């Protein structure tokens, strides 16, 4: 099942997502994760957080660019270096906008997998960018909040148009 992506202006994208309880992790939950993966690939994304499909839970899925898929539940991210990297980011929830964001180059990612088992791994370079971007969604933060003031001014009109379209669609569906 492919979910509809929530766009900039939707309230769910500004909320702090709730933790997943261990008791919630079952076959139905794993099917939900598979549907998230399908949605991510169908929309040409490299990551997708649950709030982006209207589910305020601490879950994201991502592909490291080499075909290695992760299904991440209740993530904790710890920077492992002060060295940063700047990477041009985009977001399925903020279509058509790509801007450079500076983030730690290497992080420790702790999470539960789709079976409720604890996983710890080091994410570097591109994967570090992806997991930090997706984790921000779980805290109600979009990448456009992390760009320079000048870059924000340059995209203000595009953002206003996305928000206006989101509001129009929401009103049509009510």
Curated annotation (Swiss-Prot):
GO process annotations (BP): co-translational protein modification; translation
Organism superkingdom: Bacteria
Record EC number: 3.5.1.88
Active-site residues, as the UniProt record annotates them: 134
Keyword Iron carried by entry: yes
Hydrolase recorded as keyword: yes
Cofactor binding remark: Binds 1 Fe(2+) ion.
Record-linked InterPro entries: Peptide_deformylase, Peptide_deformylase_sf
Cofactor: Fe(2+)
Catalytic activity: N-terminal N-formyl-L-methionyl-[peptide] + H2O = N-terminal L-methionyl-[peptide] + formate
Residue positions binding Fe cation: 91, 133, 137
Keywords: Hydrolase, Iron, Metal-binding, Protein biosynthesis
GO molecular function annotations of the record: metal ion binding; peptide deformylase activity
Role description: Removes the formyl group from the N-terminal Met of newly synthesized proteins. Requires at least a dipeptide for an efficient rate of reaction. N-terminal L-methionine is a prerequisite for activity but the enzyme has broad specificity at other positions.
Family note: Belongs to the polypeptide deformylase family.
Protein name: Peptide deformylase
Organism: Fusobacterium nucleatum subsp. nucleatum (strain ATCC 25586 / DSM 15643 / BCRC 10681 / CIP 101130 / JCM 8532 / KCTC 2640 / LMG 13131 / VPI 4355)
């Amino acid at each position: 099942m492919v979910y509809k992506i929530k766009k900039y202006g939707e309230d769910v994208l500004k909320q702090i997502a709730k933790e997943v309880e261990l008791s919630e992790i079952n076959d139905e939950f794993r099917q939900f994760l598979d549907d998230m993966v399908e949605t991510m690939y169908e929309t040409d994304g490299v990551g997708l957080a649950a709030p982006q499909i209207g589910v305020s839970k601490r879950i994201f899925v991502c592909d490291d660019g080499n075909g290695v898929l992760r299904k991440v539940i209740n993530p904790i991210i710890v920077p492992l270096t002060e060295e940063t990297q700047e990477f041009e980011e985009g977001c399925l929830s903020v279509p058509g906008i790509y801007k450079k964001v500076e983030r730690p180059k290497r992080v420790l990612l702790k999470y539960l997998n789709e079976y409720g088992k604890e996983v710890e791994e080091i994410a570097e370079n591109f994967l570090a960018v992806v997991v930090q971007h997706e984790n921000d969604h779980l805290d109600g933060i979009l990448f456009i909040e992390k760009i320079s003031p000048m870059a924000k001014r340059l995209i203000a009109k595009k953002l206003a148009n996305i928000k206006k379209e989101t509001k129009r669609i929401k009103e049509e569906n009510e």
